[in-house]
Amino acid sequence: MGVERMPSFLIMTHSVSKTSVPGVVIASVDQMRETIRRKGQLKGRQADDGSVQEVRALIGEAPHRRDVLIEHLHKINDAYRGLHERHLVALAKEMKLPMADVFEVATFYHHFEVLRDTDTAPGLTVRVCDGLSCELAGAKQLMERLPTLLGHADVRVIAAPCVGRCEQAPVAVVHQNPVAHATPELVAEAVHRQDIHPAPTAYVDYDAYVAEGGYRLVAELHAGQAKAEAVLTAMEDSGLRGLGGAGFPAGRKWRIVREQPTPRLMAVNIDEGEPGTFKDRTYLERDPHRFLEGMLVAAHVVGIDAIYIYLRDEYHGCRGVLTQALAQLQTRASYPLPRIELRRGAGAYICGEESAMIESIEGKRGEPRMRPPYIAQVGLFGRPTLEHNFETLYWVRDIVQKGAGWFSGFGRHGRQGLRSFSVSGRVKQPGVKLAPAGITLRELIDEHCGGMADGHTLYAYLPGGASGGILPATLADVPLDFDTLQAHGCFIGSAAVVVLSQQDRARDAALNVMRFFADESCGQCTPCRVGTDKAAQLMQAPVWDQETLLDLAQVMGDASICGLGQAAPNPIRCVLQYFTHEVDGRPDVEPVRHASPGVSP
């Protein structure tokens, strides 16, 4: 045997015997046996039997595929209120995954508490929402008082990004129980009573939904009494656009995916993380079967083989509602259903981006993909994927049964359709307001919110959540819809409207959302990762370095991979365009206002 063909484990640096081949040392038989024994062992930290048994007890007979990694991490995190290293090592062994893969996923998501084996998991965690709406309602003062009031070493109080309950601001979440209009006393009472789970919500159940005509459209499609092409045409004619923020025409998306090769998949996005947005949660808590029917109609028309529903982890109560509704549907439906899997997010805002959500469903870090290819062609598990926001599917049944003209017949100021506005901030009656597309902010507040809160005058507003920009009261008569706000440096997105008054400053709102973006950047691309953090630092100065901030805004907008980094500069640009008096060092300069106390001129 020539030296060049000799197995590497036979070539040693020293040995008791030598061959006749100059420069080559051959191992002894005992050394070869020891080398073979070592090569059969795993390298790195090994799982201990006790931890393996604890992990097995939690995941049971559930699949060990990579795409359920996050589900298994949730089970461990819930049971032990944290992820100790020993459990992560054991899970890696059980799932036959590299430990690095398990650790990098566990450390990516905010809701996973990765602990050293010597660390003690917190007995109870209270999360105080520091989103803009809660900040306006006194979240900072709540955060300051709670640690002293609670006085428990085993109770941890931390700040958390928007929890999707802005109409109830301020909000604190005691383990999984959201405390609305939270005061220190209400939170302390929930802690002392160990009231840590969400209260059950009353919703339209399967029988009540069927009694008023629910699931009839799905049954007619399966029976051939309704035609898929007619349904698709109705969707196209209605003008319904994606209501998660992107605004892509829903019917066109159905047709694109329908033309792709099989198998085709569907991913439903209920990771409602845009600060100020709570419409999906509100509808899901009240009428889950209307959404499920729209989902099944889309699946039938497009030819979907499996559906994955990605639900925001903050929505613990919704998870119970949706689990029950799916169980009712699967046991009562008289027609075949595609496979439906409910997946749980883990506190990463970036997973609201469609490709990041797909990465998360596949059990990976939620990092956006480069495009093309688009997920309609290469999506979940490499298959053509129909991705939809919850509310988009919620309206499918009404549009098809009432006709495309029913939906498109609504609208104001030349716009068509309906929009669900999540309104919070300085108004008397915050909440989800179903209103005609194209309604102005002034009309929305006067007609649907009972006017401005007492003692408050309209000063500014965010028309599209954290990323949609900030507009002054002088632009309160601009129609609110897709494509109407871009000329003013803003967009409507998910229609999360946060109203500011003369008691607030736009620069403070911009800083709040920029800090949010800095915390939520996935870190994949430098312009977003570094730019958001640097911008948040610069925005704290009494006088802004406008040139540097505009340079940062340009780089982030041009070079970021996904919408987070591209839209993060919007609040900066808006403050510099409409509220320069707040950041240029002029003392006590009031902006020009065109409204007296209240909203109506």
Question: Model-found features: residue ranges?
Answer:
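Histidine-anchored nucleotide/phosphate-binding helix
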Residues: Y109, D287-V301
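Gly-rich Lys/Arg/Thr-decorated short loops/hinges at beta-loop-alpha junctions or inter-strand turns
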Residues: V210-R216, V268-D280, I375-L380, S422-V427
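Short loop-to-beta-strand transition segments
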Residues: G450-G465
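Short amphipathic, charge-patterned alpha-helical segments
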Residues: G294-L296, A437-A453
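Hydrophobic alpha-helical positions that pack around
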Residues: R319-A437, C449
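N-terminal glycine-rich phosphate/pyrophosphate-binding loops that anchor nucleotide-derived ligands
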Residues: A230-R264
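Ferredoxin-type iron-sulfur electron-transfer modules in oxidoreductases and energy-metabolism complexes
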Residues: F9, V21, T35-V126, D130-V163, ...
